[in-house]
């Protein structure tokens, strides 16, 4: 009897309960904490999408924070550490602390930040490819999504290091649009789209998406293209993160050069003060003051011939005779000769 009742209830032709869930009129209950978090994420998504490259350092910090926190949270909460299952609050605290360290590294070391930005872009594009592939082909092995995600992430990370501005703009716009899409999915259908994407990564079967889920998913490429155009034409035009680095280096070099010049000037002044000596006044010569050595020699012979000594001659002379062995001697022509009595 009960079996017949069960068969009758099954054969009544009722619709699948999931079909009723796709109706927008179904009641949904929102928690306070996820609602506040999604509201804040909407603000971050807008900044990422339209001002990503302009706020370069902030974006590098947030990229490292989100990536590090997500990876550590999944490892701590999903896996057993030292034979103990960590609680949700403890896992979130550990993930936040390590995420802050990762954010500081990506902000201070630009190459690491750019590499992380390229990784995020590659992962997002790989996830989008898996969602599109599921509509035509279900991957039989888990290595297919893993290989696709790893290859795409490494490819776009290298491309971001090569063409930094272009792929930074593309990555920030795409990631910001993904954040806005996830927040919209929470407010409309309580993360059904996110659960569907997560099932694609685990290769598990899930219910097909509702019609408005595809509308929400279509917001992602539209917002991405809009963000790329706005950044390239408005917010990121005329701005380059490399100019900021070069200008700071130039300022440091200019300060070093100024200090080196000041030090050289001080050394030169000190050396000049130590070696400065007053020069002697040059000897004044007049026309006709130079006498031939032969004339002086004959004058001496005349003086010695009369018996006058050199000492008496020096006392009677009114002018001192200067001897110069290189250019001759110089004496004034007005010098008076001693009187010799015969």
Swiss-Prot record:
Changing residue 168 to P: Very weak enhancement of lrp6 phosphorylation. Its main location: membrane. The chain crosses the membrane at residues 32-52, 55-75, 90-110, 112-132, 141-161, 174-194, 210-230. Disruption phenotype: Morphants have defects in neural crest formation. At the tadpole stage, animals are often less pigmented with ventrally bent tails. Embryos develop smaller eyes and forebrain structures. It is a multi-pass membrane protein. Keywords: Cell membrane, Cytoplasmic vesicle, Developmental protein, Membrane, Transmembrane, Transmembrane helix, Wnt signaling pathway. Changing residue 172 to A: Very weak enhancement of lrp6 phosphorylation. GO terms for cellular component: cytoplasmic vesicle; plasma membrane; vesicle membrane. The keyword Glycosyltransferase does not apply. GO terms for biological process: Wnt signaling pathway. It is found in: Membrane; Cell membrane; Cytoplasmic vesicle. InterPro entries: TM7S3/TM198-like_dom, TMEM198. It comes from the Eukaryota. The keyword ATP-binding does not apply. Promotes lrp6 phosphorylation by casein kinases and thereby plays a role in Wnt signaling. May be a membrane scaffold protein involved in the self-aggregation of lrp6 further enhancing its activity. Required for neural crest formation. Belongs to the TMEM198 family. PANTHER family: DUF4203 DOMAIN-CONTAINING PROTEIN, TRANSMEMBRANE PROTEIN 198 FAMILY MEMBER. Interacts with lrp6. Interacts with casein kinases. This is Transmembrane protein 198.
């Amino acid at each position: 009897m009960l079996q017949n009742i069960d068969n009758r209830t099954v054969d009544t032709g009722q619709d699948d309960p999931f079909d009723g869930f796709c109706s927008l009129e179904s009641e949904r209950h929102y928690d306070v904490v996820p609602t506040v978090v999604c509201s804040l994420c909407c603000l971050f998504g807008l900044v990422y999408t339209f001002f990503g490259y302009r706020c370069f350092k902030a974006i590098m910090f947030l990229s490292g924070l989100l990536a590090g926190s997500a990876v550590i949270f999944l490892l701590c909460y999903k896996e057993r550490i030292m034979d103990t299952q960590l609680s949700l609050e403890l896992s979130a605290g550990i993930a936040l602390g390590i995420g802050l360290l990762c954010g500081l590294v990506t902000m201070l070391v630009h190459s690491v930040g750019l590499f992380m930005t390229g990784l995020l872009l590659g992962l997002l594009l790989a996830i989008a490819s898996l969602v599109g592939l599921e509509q035509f082909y279900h991957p039989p092995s888990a290595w297919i999504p893993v290989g696709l995600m790893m290859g795409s992430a490494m490819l776009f990370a290298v491309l971001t290091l090569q063409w930094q501005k272009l792929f930074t703009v593309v990555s920030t716009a795409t990631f910001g649009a993904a954040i806005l899409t996830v927040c919209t999915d929470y407010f409309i259908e309580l993360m059904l789209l996110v659960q569907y994407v997560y099932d694609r990564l685990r290769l598990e079967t899930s219910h097909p998406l509702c019609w408005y889920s595809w509308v929400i998913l279509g917001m992602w490429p539209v917002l991405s293209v809009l963000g790329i155009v706005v950044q390239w034409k408005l917010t990121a035009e005329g701005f380059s993160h490399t100019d900021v680095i070069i200008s700071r280096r130039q300022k440091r070099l200019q300060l070093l050069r100024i200090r080196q010049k000041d030090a050289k000037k001080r050394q030169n002044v000190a050396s000049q003060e130590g070696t400065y000596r007053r020069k002697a006044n040059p000897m004044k010569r007049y026309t006709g003051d130079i006498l031939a050595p032969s004339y002086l020699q004959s004058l001496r012979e005349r003086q010695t011939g009369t018996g006058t000594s050199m000492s008496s001659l020096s006392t009677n002379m009114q002018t001192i005779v200067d001897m110069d062995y290189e250019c001759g001697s110089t004496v004034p022509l007005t010098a008076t000769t001693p009187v010799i009595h015969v």
